[in-house]
Amino acid sequence: MPRLIEAPAVIEAAGTKPKRIEEYAGRVKSGHETVSVARMKSPEGWVEPGQTPAFEEITLVLAGMLRVEHAGGALEVHAGQAVIATPGEWVRYNTPEPGGAEYVAVCLPAFSPDTVHRDA
């Protein structure tokens, strides 16, 4: 039988300003270990620590612009665009523009603080 997720789990985010993470499926909300799906709302000027995650992360930007820094430079991902970060690849996310950004992140396997491998 299909299972309705009536409301997400709100998770504390890393970064320089408060960012809202709403997990709809994943380790915290639904017990899924193979996938996580979360909506993020980050303010203008938010910067996350760099990371080298052990999971694939597919990010769909719904509003605003998400900058994704990587070893070879940076990508500006705008509303209606998506970016895929592969496991073992260093990335750093930030939202420098007015209004910040809203986006959905899908992680395979599910996001875990133990496998995100943030910069020290």
Q: Predicted regions span which residues?
A:
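Short histidine-centered beta-strand/loop micro-motifs
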Residues: 26-27, 47-53, 70, 94-96, ...
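Short, conserved beta-strand element in jelly-roll/cupin
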Residues: 39-42, 52-68, 106
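Short acidic-glycine-tyrosine-enriched beta hairpin
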Residues: 72-88
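Structural motif
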Residues: 65-67, 74, 90, 100
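A short, N-terminal "cap"/entry segment at the start of jelly-roll beta-barrel domains
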Residues: 1-34, 41, 49, 115-120
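Ligand-binding loop in jelly-roll beta-barrel domains
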Residues: 31, 87-113
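Hydrophobic/aromatic beta-strand elements that line small-molecule binding cavities or substrate pockets
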Residues: 26, 38-40, 58, 81, ...
